[in-house]
Amino acid sequence: MAESKEAIWQRAGGFGVDIPFVTLLGFELTQFEGGQSEIVFAPKPEHLNSFSVTHGGALMTLLDVSMATAARSQLPEMGVVTIEMKTSFMQPAIPGSGPLVAKGVLMHRTATMAFTQSTVFDGAGRACAHATGTFKYLKRLPSGAKSTHSLNTASGQVSTD
């Protein structure tokens, strides 16, 4: 029996932190385990560019978040920050063919770094965009020259800090 979306969300602590931009876009985490993640995104008219296809910035955010969650699936108590990301746009993500699905994979990790990749597929299963990314595992985010602050915890979630 497949794991329920609620169980995945609970195990991942949602996305683990409150990310208002991800909430605004409406991403839905559907897989979070074993170095893999899957996020579903149904673009709305406000997510399109002047050619009436999904905006590249929305696709890059989807790729970034799917790679980050793939990295975090191995260490869900840690946060990650993007160090580097390279994106290739292969074909337009045309609305109406169904939701987009990003499949992130953790290819390698060290104690502090994660090396990932992700592909966004359209509703017909065609690859629209692909990215590779490097992420740093963090317990806290730096703020200022010599200070740190905690990650924004998701609503109803208990911080591990």
Go through the PLM ranges and name each one.
Residues 1-161:
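Terminal targeting signals and extreme-terminal segments of soluble enzymes
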